[in-house]
Amino acid sequence: MNEAVSPGALSTLFTDARTHNGWREPPVSDETLREIYAQMKWGPTSANCSPARIVFIRTAEGKERLRPALSSGNLQKTLTAPVTAIVAWDSEFYERLPQLFPHGDARSWFTSSPQLAEETAFRNSSMQAAYLIVACRALGLDTGPMSGFDRQYVDDAFFAGSTLKSNLLINIGYGDSSKLFARLPRLSFEEACGLL
């Protein structure tokens, strides 16, 4: 049986963690980005399909390529973030299933149903984005996930000629707590859950 993590760890990962809009100076190293992926990749996906593909934008040139896709409310926080991750999904993720899930012909489950392939890729890449957020928090970083952007523009600017499609953006860095909004409420257990 696994041991529960400490209350302090739960606070870091969930109860005290915030979505950040402002950032402090320290950069995020490429080694740290590699460590984020090294942790998040172990999160479960259906049939181990692992459809997420991530572009970590950490240069001014990369941010300028992204700028036209951003909504006005997300512009400044993204341009000043040390890193912005484009979390995309690979529409042909199933081509890696002989390696990732070598139990029967899992590839055929998706080649025979494009709708199932798309639903699976989008759903599981969304889960992987959540794992990325938790990995960042576990490594002492803050995040700011966003869906307010022009996905078609991002796909054309970053993924033209590929099988990748953007899902969401996540700003990554060391947050400036002085720029946080007041903490918003969450639904109670009774409002969000049922017991049968």
Curated annotation (Swiss-Prot):
Q: Which InterPro entries match?
A: Nitroreductase (IPR029479), Nitroreductase-like (IPR000415), Nitroreductase_HadB/RutE (IPR050461), RutE-like (IPR023936)
Q: Keyword Ribosomal protein, does the record have it?
A: no
**Which GO terms label this protein's molecular function in UniProt?**
3-hydroxypropionate dehydrogenase (NADP+) activity
Q: What induces it?
A: Up-regulated by the nitrogen regulatory protein C (NtrC also called GlnG) and repressed by RutR.
Question: Which cofactors does this protein require?
Answer: FMN
**Entry keywords, A to Z:** Flavoprotein, FMN, NAD, NADP, Oxidoreductase
Q: Which GO terms describe its biological process?
A: nitrogen utilization; uracil catabolic process
Quickly give the catalysed reaction: 3-hydroxypropanoate + NADP(+) = 3-oxopropanoate + NADPH + H(+)
> What's its EC?
1.1.1.298
| A Pfam family of this chain | Nitroreductase
Could you tell me what this protein does? May reduce toxic product malonic semialdehyde to 3-hydroxypropionic acid, which is excreted.
Q: Which family does it belong to?
A: Belongs to the nitroreductase family. HadB/RutE subfamily.
List the protein's name: Probable malonic semialdehyde reductase RutE
What's the gene? rutE
